[in-house]
């Protein structure tokens, strides 16, 4: 949020959204971005109506928020501006982050909300299982290194690892969840 915003919690945002349906704007890095999907899920659960303002990347959205062209931003690109004091954090889409321990997850306010942005490593079809397991072991070791954890935390990120099968299961669950959000919100990709 812009520091000038009257909202100081996600609950404040929801109250404003309920009092003024279709008035509050939120920026994201684009249509179909994880941040867009997260806010569509919020609207679905809370029965609120917000106006999505998609940008061509997070940096443009951050600039728009600082310039008070939008009411709020849902994008990791804002982390540097939060740390620099130019923006105030209200909530994160996943669980609390070590880098922002006083910033609650949306799920702490919106019952049933569960959404995290994530990255994963994939290998070409047909890659031997032994190679996949070895890569997974190497990634786990790298993710456990204190300097890697510290660097990720400095970017507002946290490393979480899994087994290859857990990741396959996660992909399936996420694909189904995003599909439901897209269908319910009638999102069209151009």
Show which residues each predicted segment covers.
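Generic structural signal for alpha-helix termini and adjacent loop/cap motifs
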Residues: 16, 20, 68, 76, ...
